[in-house]
């Protein structure tokens, strides 16, 4: 029997950790530092063109199936079809409306999943606008009776693995136990019942799904086997923001979707009103037969074109450092990104952890209702605007200090990578509480005389000495301490546990007593479910994750903490590099800093591709087997 021609598309997107900027990041005046993770969400789309045969009649609907191999009853089946337009478009040519409906059987068994259904619905609409409805239908016609089959799968760290490992209540998994699990482990529950770890699973899933589906519909075409143009990445970002906001029923801060596209960054929120008209449409995916003809006509008549809104060059997507009150909190990181960019497409300033620093994530066996925390803080800010403004500015200064000091470390590494790593290695063996005394014993060489043209550059001592590297690490440590203090104050003022005392005291003890730990905090909106630690990695005496966790558990036992802490295997990811990052150092070539910025950009572009990524099945361990479980 003749075989059809199969076509596959695979995309992955990383999770995130909001290291600094919780609550403040909702206001464009204040940036947030977002670190992407090594844990990723994968989306695989497959369709098969039937063998050539006499022309078949036009189908009335086209099947789209989305499956997850990790959850019980996680199969969502949809039918895509066109509905004749009841009102003319701008060019007076009636264009059919594309809709999707969930099958009744799928609805009964799997339930609704707005993150999946709205991602598909908006992507289908945008593809029709980009390529034309006829071309889209011709492509779907070629998918045959099986339609498009999509598999979504997440790295294990997105979900708590306590039940997967059959651990007794109050027992946390070990690094070895987590490492022994197969990739994409089944969770033994429905998706609505899973315990998440706060890495941004819904944003990573939504982003990978819209990217994969848009690529599979050939509305966006890669410029090579594994890369996308900056404009296409920005378009996918905007589409994912829309789908994610619609699924949540509100316009959120957007940093999690941004991290899923651009990787680690200094994030500043887009103008929220850019999406308001789209959300006002009330896009919804119904079950077949659930919506009457009159209701559908009324709903579809309110639709607007998506492309003008989602256009990468729409100025409303350009983040502004000015708030509604005219306040501004700009950073050196953003200034460098603007000066070194060739492109007009809005995208965040890349900022990743410097070499020699990494992120440790702890899963706490408790939970926080993030929307409740956020609503209470926003209510306090509205009730006490003067207090809030003052406190927000104090926290923002600490956040800015952290971002700029991390950039300073990256510049020191770019100046002399070997000497930099040598000094990081020696510092990694000592507790952060000992660093200040050590600094006083180190010689501080006088700066060479510099011309007035280099006066701004001379404000930063970029000579790589033990003193300059240690001073920068101390400044990062102090910024993390200040951020924690500010967030504690915010929680006390608003009456919410942004940093619960039992977690805060443990973070302090770990930061003070475990050698090489720079500091830590509670990510995002805070609460009881997680915390992070930033620590130094020694190239001479490396600690594996098990050794580091043994040190943390020793501190926890000494503190007689009752918290149940579990490790995550995820590490810090980097910033995405794009085509417009190449060939521009952002500095006058006559400047002595020109070579330094070239080295900095070269180090950012080295290694693996971060952010949104095109994949091959064979390159992702366990993905082929996970897809097969869905068959």
Task: Say what each PLM segment does.
Residues 198-223:
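DPxDG-like acidic metal-binding loop motif
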Residues 1-20, 24-26, 34-149, 153-195, ...:
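C-terminal nucleotide
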Residues 528:
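Active-site pocket scaffolds in enzymes
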Residues 200-202, 256, 524:
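Residue-level detector of functionally special positions within alpha-helical transmembrane segments
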């Amino acid at each position: 029997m003749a075989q059809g021609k199969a076509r596959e598309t695979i995309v992955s997107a990383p999770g995130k950790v909001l290291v600094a900027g919780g609550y403040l990041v909702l206001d464009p005046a204040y940036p947030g530092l977002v670190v992407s993770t090594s844990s990723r969400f994968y989306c695989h789309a497959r369709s098969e063109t039937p063998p050539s045969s006499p022309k078949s009649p036009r189908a009335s609907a086209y099947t789209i199936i989305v499956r997850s191999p990790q959850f019980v009853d996680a199969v969502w089946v949809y039918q895509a079809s066109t509905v004749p337009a009841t009102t003319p478009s701008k060019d007076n040519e009636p264009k059919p409306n594309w809709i999707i409906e969930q099958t009744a059987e799928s609805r009964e068994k799997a339930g609704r999943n707005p993150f999946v259904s709205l991602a598909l619905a908006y992507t289908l609409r945008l593809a029709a606008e980009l390529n034309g409805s006829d071309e889209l239908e011709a492509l779907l016609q070629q998918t045959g009776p099986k339609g498009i089959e999509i598999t979504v799968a997440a790295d294990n760290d997105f979900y708590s693995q306590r039940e997967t490992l059959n651990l007794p209540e109050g027992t946390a998994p070990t690094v070895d136990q987590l490492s022994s699990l197969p990739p994409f482990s089944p969770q033994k529950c429905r998706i609505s019942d899973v315990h998440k770890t706060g890495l941004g699973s819904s944003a990573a899933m939504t982003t990978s799904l819209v990217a994969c589906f848009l690529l599979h519909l050939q509305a966006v075409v890669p410029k090579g086997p594994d890369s996308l143009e900056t404009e296409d990445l920005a378009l996918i970002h905007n589409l994912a923001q829309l789908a994610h906001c619609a699924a949540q029923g509100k316009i959120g801060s957007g940093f999690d979707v941004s991290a899923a596209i651009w990787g680690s960054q200094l994030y500043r929120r887009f103008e929220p009103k850019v999406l308001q008209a789209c959300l006002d449409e009330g896009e919804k995916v119904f079950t077949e037969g659930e919506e009457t003809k009159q209701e559908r006509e009324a709903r579809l008549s309110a639709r607007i074109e998506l492309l003008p809104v989602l256009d990468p060059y729409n100025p409303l997507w350009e983040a502004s450092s000015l708030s509604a009150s005219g306040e501004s909190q700009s950073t050196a990181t953003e200034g460098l990104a603007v000066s070194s960019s060739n492109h007009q497409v809005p995208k965040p300033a890349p900022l990743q952890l410097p070499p020699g620093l990494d992120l440790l994530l702890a899963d706490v066996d408790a939970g926080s209702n993030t929307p409740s925390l956020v609503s209470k803080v926003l209510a306090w800010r509205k009730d006490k605007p003067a207090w809030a403004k003052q406190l927000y500015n104090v926290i923002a200064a600490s956040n800015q200090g952290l971002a700029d000091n991390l950039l300073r470390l990256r510049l020191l590494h770019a100046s002399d990578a070997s000497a930099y790593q040598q000094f990081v290695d020696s510092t990694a063996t000592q507790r952060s509480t000992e660093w200040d005394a050590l600094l006083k014993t180190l010689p501080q060489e006088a700066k060479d005389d510099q011309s007035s043209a280099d006066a701004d550059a001379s404000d930063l001592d970029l000579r790589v000495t033990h003193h300059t590297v240690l001073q920068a690490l101390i400044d990062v440590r102090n910024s993390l301490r200040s951020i924690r203090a500010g967030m504690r104050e915010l929680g006390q003022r608003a009456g919410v546990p942004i940093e619960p005392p039992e977690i805060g005291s443990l973070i302090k003890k770990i930061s003070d007593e475990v050698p090489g730990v720079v500091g830590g905090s509670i990510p995002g909106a805070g609460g009881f479910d997680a915390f992070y630690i930033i620590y130094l990695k020694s190239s001479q005496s490396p600690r594996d994750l098990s050794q580091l966790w043994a040190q943390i558990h020793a501190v926890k036992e000494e503190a007689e903490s009752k918290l149940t802490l579990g490790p995550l295997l995820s590490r810090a990811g980097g910033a995405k590099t794009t085509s417009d990052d190449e060939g521009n150092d952002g500095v006058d070539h006559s400047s002595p800093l020109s070579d330094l910025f070239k080295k900095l950009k070269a180090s950012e572009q080295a290694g693996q591709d971060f952010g949104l990524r095109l994949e091959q099945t064979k390159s992702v361990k366990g993905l082929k087997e996970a897809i097969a479980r869905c068959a």
